[in-house]
């Protein structure tokens, strides 16, 4: 693997960290360690979201950049007499990407390696072999011989189970493969926007936020937004890349490496037109590539944030990503860097007058 520079080291640390919804502590600590040098203060709300505040002007408009800390994973629900683990998915999973995948169970005594198993195809009927194994029929094998042995190792119902995958820089070093891009890339964007603004004069109060429990209903975004009361918000997340075999442009038109995605519509929100226009104008002026997209079957933290208090103009800016909600997703470094650049340039242009124009035009 290529030698990791400062950015790649941060991305590796963020994606290697383990944190399903409700269990984001490790990820929060990693994000805090990277964002704290660029913030005036860092706090955590009572649900667990990290809020890093950087003040440009004391009475300036509040700009919220939210990426969620949590990743899709699993939770221990039962231990069988023979020491196998029954589990619950936490976040959205597709059964076809799960079998024979390595996982890590995080217990009070330490981490335990397991593998997702099911009945072997060799003993299935020809009809059964043609069907996907249902998640309810899967289990996790940790090499225990009994329930007592698993308990002795520290495994308990409610323990977090996380996909295991090593952060990898591909042969084309712009292509990055890792677990949990959804949504550690959003956390990284929030960190680097605050990094860019550390020596920049601007009349805004900027909040870089790592929200919790996005994958189970945008829950942390709701409490964080109530805490901040933002005037403008950006949800930063992964989006769908439509550049692999079998996907038509009608289904997904974005391509990796062609710029961040500006989401005009998703299942949780109709994007704010004034904010969309301001972002597009900034991208055009700065020569930053971008792509439009709409996601009928998913949403981001913007969906919760825009409904806060008396309403918040919000826009999702996402990174085209292959194979999301699996053990190994892939994205393009240029898209990440251009997303950071775009949001930074937008914030530099914002002030109270501009925010009011965006909001009420």
Curated annotation (Swiss-Prot):
Organism superkingdom: Bacteria
EC annotation from Swiss-Prot or TrEMBL: 3.4.11.-
Positions bound to a divalent metal cation 1: 68, 182, 237
Gene Ontology MF term list: metal ion binding; metalloaminopeptidase activity
Active site: 214
Statement: the UniProt record of this protein carries the keyword Metal-binding: yes
Enzyme class: hydrolase
Assembly: Homododecamer.
Task performed by this protein: Putative aminopeptidase.
Protein's name in the database: Putative aminopeptidase YsdC
Organism: Bacillus subtilis (strain 168)
Upper classification of the organism: Bacteria, Bacillati, Bacillota, Bacilli, Bacillales
Gene that this polypeptide is encoded by: ysdC
């Amino acid at each position: 693997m290529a030698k990791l520079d400062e950015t790649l080291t941060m991305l590796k640390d963020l994606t290697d960290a383990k944190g399903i919804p409700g269990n984001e502590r490790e990820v929060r600590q990693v994000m805090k360690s990277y964002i704290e040098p660029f913030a005036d203060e860092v706090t955590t709300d009572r649900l667990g979201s990290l809020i890093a505040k950087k003040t440009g002007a004391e009475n300036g408009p509040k700009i919220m950049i939210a990426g969620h800390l949590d990743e899709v994973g699993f939770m221990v629900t039962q231990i069988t007499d023979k020491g196998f683990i029954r589990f619950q998915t936490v976040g959205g999973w597709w059964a076809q990407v799960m079998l024979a995948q390595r996982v890590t169970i995080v217990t009070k005594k330490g981490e335990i390696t397991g593998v997702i198993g099911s009945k072997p195809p060799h003993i299935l009927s020809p009809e059964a072999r043609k069907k996907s194994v249902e998640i309810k029929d899967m289990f996790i094998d940790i090499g225990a011989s009994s329930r007592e042995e698993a308990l002795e190792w520290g495994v308990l119902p409610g323990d977090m189970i996380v996909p295991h995958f090593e952060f990898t820089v591909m042969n084309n070093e712009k292509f990055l493969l890792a677990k949990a891009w959804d949504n550690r890339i959003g956390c990284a964007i929030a960190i680097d926007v605050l990094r860019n603004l550390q020596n920049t004069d601007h009349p805004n109060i900027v909040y870089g936020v790592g929200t919790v429990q996005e994958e189970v209903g945008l829950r942390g975004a709701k409490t964080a937004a109530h805490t901040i009361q933002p005037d403008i918000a950006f949800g930063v997340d992964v989006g769908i890349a439509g550049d692999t075999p079998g996907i038509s442009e009608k289904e997904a038109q974005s391509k990796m490496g062609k710029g961040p995605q500006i989401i005009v519509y998703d299942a949780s929100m109709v994007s704010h037109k004034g904010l969309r226009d301001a972002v597009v104008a900034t991208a055009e002026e700065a020569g930053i590539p971008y792509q439009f997209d709409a996601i009928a079957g998913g949403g981001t933290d913007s969906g919760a944030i825009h409904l806060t208090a008396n309403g918040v103009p919000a826009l999702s800016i996402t990174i085209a990503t292959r194979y999301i909600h699996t053990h190994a997703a892939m994205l393009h470094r240029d898209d990440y860097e251009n997303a950071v650049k775009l949001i930074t340039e937008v914030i530099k242009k914002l002030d109270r007058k501009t925010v009011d124009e965006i909001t009420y035009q």
